Amino acid sequence: FMIEKLARMPVEVDYGSEFRYRDPILGSDTLTVVISQSGETADTLAAQREAKQKGSKTLAICNVVGSMITREAAGTIYTHAGPEIGVASTKAFTSQLTALFILALYLGQTRGVLDEATSRCLVQELLHIPARLETVLSHDPMFEELARQLFRATDFLFLGRGVHFPIALEGALKLKEISYIHAEGYPAGEMKHGPNALIDEELPVVVLATRDPSQPESRILYEKTVSNIQEVKAREGIVIAVVTEGDDEAARVADHAIQIPASTELLLPILEIVPLQLLAYHIAVRRGCDVDQPRNLAKSVTVE
């Protein structure tokens, strides 16, 4: 989303474990970006080697200096998030989003897609993110209260559109990793193709309903997302909506509203994921789960 929007370059996204087995079409004019917190992830490393073998340049986004992936890449963007002890990634994921935004911004500038004024505006928005994250973190007591009300649920559904859909996937992953609750991330626009059948009065549905009023596409997706919330409510689902501050339209139709500071559309995911991480944390604690060392999982997956 970020690179296509800011640099107007076509982008494909794939799992490292799937990439090498589909015989990808690559060449010297293709850049393969590999993302790994540890830099030792077996599937990602194998995907990088496959890309290099086919003549593609590789760029690593990694947290660990000197790791295998960084040594084999043509270039590296280090996230410098510091050691991440818990198995479930939190700050590393957030810093990866930031690194991808900076990469997209750089590509947009060098390709002449972004003018100087737009670039400066986006940089200023990025510089505001730490303070806005502090605001999100200050709402932690609310996330704890939400967890108290929801920790007995057996299933969760996370919905998002556009750039917010990957955050729905990540939010669902965090919850299932550390609380052992079945959770599914889904494109909000696909609800009629299956997920609607799951909705009842016992299903919490987390909906990413933020918006950037300055972006026409954001406003359109927002209106469609509000419609999705109304669909869930019509089926008696429990809606937890993540909304931007000052927005009462989505908040009014939801059961619970998590407010985050306003930002430009492509930076909203960085602010959205933190409440979902904290909600997963508090639910896991309520359920008596080991948040740092979830069962059957390892921090660095070094075997296929």
Which role does the model predict for each range below?
Residues 1-304:
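A SIS-like phosphosugar-recognition module
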